[in-house]
Design a protein with these regions (language model features):
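Conserved Rossmann-fold cofactor-binding substructure of NAD(P)-dependent oxidoreductases
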Residues: 57-73
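C-terminal helical subdomain
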Residues: 179, 194-245, 249, 253-256, ...
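A glycine-rich helix->loop->beta "capping" turn
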Residues: 46-48, 68-80, 86-92
Length: 265
């Protein structure tokens, strides 16, 4: 039995993943952004070990979420499933922290949560095939100066999620840290015409979080059914370290060194 946190598990792929983990006998903590959605998650997933509430569009909310999660002890796995998309937006949307909303929820929140929690055994960052269309500029990650394009901005956050997974895999060799493209899935975000079943997408998350065998006991990988893989440019170690430093500057929290002191297992 593993203790697993699935963020954004009030509905969509996250709820399916949490349900599958519970059915598999695991101790599962589900997450919702507010109390109303937490009540929905609790009703839908009565076998969950707990429901954690925290608004990932707020630095204070994410920090408080990490504090509440410490009551569960060291987590075996964290699935960073929560995310938002504003593909057709005509202009940037800022959070209360003055940060671009997709960047804060999709990238900065999983970084901050990871940095604040005791180092887990596994990390799963949910990326997207749209990462292939991302355009990383560390001097302008939030599109302050570049012309705004919601599609490109979202794609960039998904590429940054992939980069975070690899960067943390390098920093924490005793944690299995990987990124996953779940496909175009029939959810509120993906729409009713999407071809992929959320149950199948959830199984991919569960496999990376709890599976055994050489296929999943790896680290620093991007799992996808598509042909595209990131090239060495975006996975350059110096760029990855610069991304971690940028996230640390924005949050005021450094990602600590490897607490386990050994190779991933």
């Amino acid at each position: 039995m593993r203790t697993v946190l699935v963020t954004g598990s009030a509905d969509g792929i996250g709820r399916h993943a949490a349900a599958q983990l519970i059915a598999g006998g695991h101790r599962v903590i589900v997450h919702a952004r507010n109390e109303d959605r937490a009540a929905d998650a609790k009703a839908a997933l009565p076998g969950a070990a707990g429901v954690a509430v925290g608004d990932l569009s707020s630095l204070a909310g994410t920090t408080a979420l990490a504090g509440s999660l410490r009551a569960y002890g060291r987590l075996d796995a964290v699935v960073h499933n929560a995310g938002i998309a504003r593909l057709d937006s005509s202009e940037r949307e800022l959070t209360g922290d003055g940060l671009e909303s997709m960047f804060q929820v999709n990238v900065l929140a999983p970084y901050l949560l990871t940095a604040l929690l005791p180092q887990p055994g596994r990390l799963v960052f949910v990326s997207s095939a749209m990462a292939a269309g991302g355009a990383v500029d560390l001097a302008d990650l939030q599109f302050d100066r570049r012309p705004w394009n919601g599609f490109t901005a979202y794609s960039t956050t998904k590429l940054l999620d992939l980069m975070l997974a690899v960067a943390i895999a390098r920093r924490w060799p005793s944690t299995l840290s990987n990124a996953l493209d779940p496909g175009w899935v029939r959810t509120k975000m993906g729409g009713d015409t999407a071809p992929a079943d959320p149950e199948d997408a959830a199984r991919a998350e569960v496999r990376l979080a709890t599976g055994t065998g050489p296929g999943v006991q790896v680290t620093g990988r991007y799992f996808t059914d598509r042909d595209w893989q990131p090239d060495g440019t975006v996975l350059d170690p110096a760029l990855l370290e610069a991304l971690l430093a940028h996230c640390a500057d924005l949050t005021g929290v450094q990602l600590p060194g490897d607490e386990q002191g050994g190779p991933a297992a």
